Amino acid sequence: MSLSFKNIVFPEEWQVPPNDYIFIDDCYEEALQFNLFERGDEKSYTWMYHTISCCAYFWCKCSRSEMKLIGHLMLWTFLLDDILDSDKVNDAEAIEMIKRTEFIFIEGKLPENPTDLEKYTCYLRNEGLKIAGDREDMFNMFLTNSIQWILSIIPLNKSMEHKLPPHLQLHGYLRKLNVGVELCQGFTYLIFANNKVNPAIFNSPRYKKMLECTSMVVSHVNDMASYCKEVKNGGGFINSLLILQKRADPLSIEHSYQVIAEQTNAFIRDFIYQEKMLLESISDEQQNEVKVFLDHMKYLMKGNYLWSGTTARYASKSSPFVEMQKSLNVHLDNEIDASSL
């Protein structure tokens, strides 16, 4: 079977060369200081490399120092999410972990008996405060977006505990929060905290709609890329393709992809329309100020599309998508029985 991402159509101008990957080793060295990995553990390094390498596509024009902070923040999200997605913690432990992490973001200090990951969380939160400087509004948006993402993890995980898949609209609502687009935008608020954007723009319905469109495009492409990984790890009910395959009137993988691809292209078209209308409604000066944030949404959408076809995080010879059959690594096994497609 050879489905392809190529049915997803992006404007050509959205494609920008990825940033240098050198920031990954910068992050790795500092992560070792927080005891997050053991030096020489090739499997952990491979896992980290193929997760935070997405940053090179999402923030393709940032400096090395900016990329190091972004890389750390992205690493933190994957570390936290992978723990909560696994069987390493039970429900009570997961809820307590969420509460303690939220406390760190709000208070800027550590809870009692902090773990190494919590120390890392607090360090990054307070580094963000330094970078934001006197732009308390930008820092607060970073905090709020981060907390909302943290609080979305358990509800999304719980949505796949039922015998039947959730309705696609319910799944989409949860994924808009959990896929991390607004979280990534929060990182961008820190990096470009000195931009003189009128805060009313960030709160406008059009800007919010563009974030929603971006979230759904990233979510759908991620569902295509991670298809085999989700099947293998039992996370099928958080994958839109598998939801369509498992519902009462099941669709084939080919038909499921057609439905999701059409939805994705519709979100891209809506984003383009909303951007046009937003820019026409503000001054030339404000257009220049908000451009970096709108461009970042485009880099998230097209960058995720490009990165997904290169990372071994989701690669699988048994994937129905030809792009995912190429980039393989012995440390990341996503192979599944073809009969499950």
Curated annotation (Swiss-Prot):
Terpene synthase that converts its substrate farnesyl diphosphate (FPP) into the sesquiterpenes beta-elemene, germacrene D and a yet unidentified sesquiterpene. This is Terpene synthase 9. One of its GO terms (molecular function) is metal ion binding. GO terms for biological process: terpene biosynthetic process. Contains several highly conserved motifs that are important for catalytic activity including the aspartate-rich 'DDxx(x)D/E' motif and the 'NDxxSxxxD/E' motif, both of which are involved in complexing metal ions to coordinate the binding of the isoprenyl diphosphate substrate in the active site. Keywords: Lyase, Metal-binding. A motif (NDxxSxxxD/E motif) lies at residues 222-230. PANTHER family: BETA-PINACENE SYNTHASE-RELATED, TERPENE SYNTHASE. Its EC number is 4.2.3.-. SUPFAM superfamilies: Terpenoid synthases (SSF48576). InterPro entries: Isoprenoid_synthase_dom_sf, Terpene_cyclase-like_2. Pfam families: Terpene_syn_C_2. A motif (DDxx(x)D/E motif) lies at residues 81-86. It catalyses: (2E,6E)-farnesyl diphosphate = (1S,2S,4R)-beta-elemene + diphosphate; (2E,6E)-farnesyl diphosphate = germacrene D + diphosphate. Belongs to the terpene synthase family.
